[in-house]
């Protein structure tokens, strides 16, 4: 297991359980937003919780939509699982910028990619390949996902 600033790469051995931070409660020792079992591959998450952009009294996400130049507001957090950590890192930014429906379609159409999103209203959304916590084969969707 390699942890590079929160982006993970896991190769071989037993699957690990990863708790995904809830950006609405970015504190130590609070329950995670969700959990996922990572068997082999990379995992990356992105949210505005740890690196907000402050302009005067306003607080924005540090993730900017390259199409508009403005901070993303519709997605509070994005997490992806991919074959490696670098791909997961890039894919997390992509799905975090896209609208939720577009992000899920992108993940479903991309081999080896799965994503989990928290939208601005608190809804959780998962792509088809997002593994359910406790299912080592990753064959089932999370019970808590809404789509």
Language-model features, listed with the residues they occupy:
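Mature catalytic core of soluble alpha/beta enzymes
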Residues: 1-147
